[in-house]
């Protein structure tokens, strides 16, 4: 099971990939972000939804995200984790302080996501679009001495999503809302998935400060034959199911440059780490 739960938080990686999904960039404009993402856990959700302990494991990720307007109706999107570290800490006796089991780490390139987005409809405050995303197995699905330190899941997947976005006022203050629903067709005996999410945000200080809250959900169709059992937690497993909540704060210190901080955590799940993830990044707006 060690090998299959080290594969499940891939979905958490791709949540950030779609942060700006409902707002297409105009022709020649773009949004680019360099981020560091981290998660460390000593417990995980089992395949029955209970929480069990595991050796402390973690994943650290450096990635580039980009979205560029080919036209006002077509955008290209890329998520490139150019450095992924999968590791396990030393196991130390609480009585003698002796190292019982040496830790291990494995570094490599991660799985990329490449997508194209098309505007279906836009009128007044409402916008609708669709995204086709290809999950490229550019990471290592058998990393480390026992093959459990993966930086990718080894399978090529195709995800189709429908997005809806709107703006509204509350207490005379402007907000935006986003939602999506999608289907992820997975290969190599992984189960297909249904995904959905919501996001609400607003800005302050003349648009320099952005605050947002989001929730994401994934449900497995359980139509794959790959074993989902795991006793050690994971970020790329089969039959992952969870509901996560989180938020992000971003500050634009110039018209084109800014910093962001993010936090996300699963509040329920199956075959996934039971611990929060943290992200920090710097972004550039091409206008």
Where are these regions (language model features)?
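Repeated loop/turn-to-beta-strand initiation elements of outer-membrane beta-barrel proteins
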Residues: 73-78, 124-128, 170-175, 207-211, ...
């Amino acid at each position: 099971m060690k090998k299959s739960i080290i594969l499940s938080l891939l979905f958490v990686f791709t949540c950030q990939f779609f942060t700006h999904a409902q707002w297409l960039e105009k022709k020649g404009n773009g949004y680019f972000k360099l981020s560091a993402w981290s998660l460390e856990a000593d417990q995980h959700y089992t395949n029955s939804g209970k929480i069990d302990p595991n050796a402390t494991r973690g994943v650290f990720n450096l990635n580039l995200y980009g979205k560029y307007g080919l036209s006002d109706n077509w955008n290209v999107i890329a998520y490139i984790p150019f450095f992924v570290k999968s590791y396990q800490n030393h196991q130390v006796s609480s009585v003698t302080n002796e190292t019982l089991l040496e830790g291990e780490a494995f570094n490599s390139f991660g799985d990329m996501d490449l997508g194209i987005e098309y505007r279906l409809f836009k009128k007044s405050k409402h916008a609708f679009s669709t995204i086709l995303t290809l999950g490229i197995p550019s990471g290592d699905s058998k990393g480390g001495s026992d093959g459990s330190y993966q930086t990718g899941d080894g399978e090529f997947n195709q995800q189709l999503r429908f997005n809806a976005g709107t703006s509204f006022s509350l207490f005379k203050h402007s907000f935006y809302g986003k939602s999506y629903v999608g289907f992820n067709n997975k290969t190599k005996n992984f189960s297909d998935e249904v995904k959905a999410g919501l996001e609400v945000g607003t800005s302050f200080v003349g648009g320099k400060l952005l605050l947002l809250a989001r929730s994401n959900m994934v449900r497995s169709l359980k139509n794959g034959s790959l074993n989902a059992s795991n006793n050690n937690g994971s970020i790329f497993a089969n039959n992952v199911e969870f509901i996560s909540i989180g938020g992000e704060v971003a500050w634009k210190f110039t018209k084109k440059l800014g910093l962001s901080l993010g936090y996300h955590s699963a509040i329920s799940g199956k075959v996934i780490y039971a611990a929060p993830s943290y992200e920090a990044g710097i972004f550039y707006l091409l206008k």
